[in-house]
Amino acid sequence: MRLSLSTTICSCAMFAVSSSIQAAKVWTVDELVEKNIEARGGIAAIRAMKSLKLTGKLLLNQGQFEMAIVQTFKRPAQVRFEATVQGLTQTQVYDGKSGWQINPFSGRKDPERLSSDDSKGLAEAASEFDGSLVDWKAKGATVNYLGTEDVDGTLAHKIRLSRPNGDVEYIFLDPDHFLEIRTLSQRIEHGVQLAIETDLGDYEKVNGVYIPFATETGKQGSTDKQKTMINKAEVNPVVDDKVFAFPAAKSKK
């Protein structure tokens, strides 16, 4: 089942009226979080996901450069990203404690450890397998509702989530469907403040959970964004922990 938020909102006038009514309501953070979780499929369906494998393509340089990608997630906090082009595969992994990568595009074919700063994005993706708003209190985060803000013509609900490590994420929810349509992640890497913006859409329901099949990610304000297009999503595939482990050194003969 495919749900295109932008198409639905733009083509149906009654949804615009509904948006105005929803926006006029005085919302609390708890209500919006509950609405978001329900919209995604419900807490039971979300927690039933023990692993997730996404296959698709990554478009760079405004679509001029294409890579085949595979993203594999596994509880409690493991993730593996693979991007392949012309027979070369770049691999980035977070094993639950630290990150590592193999980057043949920089002339390095052997695995190398990543610093804690370089692993931040991977660690966040792995630890937020359920989504940032699920169990935010248990994660030690602070959440505030900041009212509504225009997101490309949609008056979205804006939520600020502050993590214990100081990172901040702004989450924008569609006023009708309560699914994420944009996130803005602010974090410090190597002493530099980064602001990464991600637009989400083309939601499909897989095993009872809505998953965005199209995302665009880049620095806030930049027109050059990476576009990810998923063509296959597998919920609860068998995933061996070995795929996340740092490869053993090859014996030299």
Question: What are these language model-derived features?
Answer:
Residues M1-S6:
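Positively charged n-region of N-terminal signal peptides that target proteins for export
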Residues T8-S18:
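Bacterial N-terminal signal peptides
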Residues S19-A23:
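Sec/Tat signal peptide C-region and signal peptidase I cleavage site
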Residues A24-K25, V29-G107, G140-G147:
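N-terminal mature ectodomain segment of secretory-pathway/periplasmic proteins
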Residues M49-S51, P76, A138-G140, T154-A156, ...:
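Extracytoplasmic
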Residues L88, T148, D152-A249:
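Gly/Pro-enriched, hydrophobic low-complexity segments
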Residues W100-F129:
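Acidic/charged, solvent-exposed loop-and-adjacent secondary-structure segments enriched in E/D, K/R, S/T
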Residues L122-R160, L179-R182:
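Short, conserved active-site entrance elements at the starts or edges of catalytic domains
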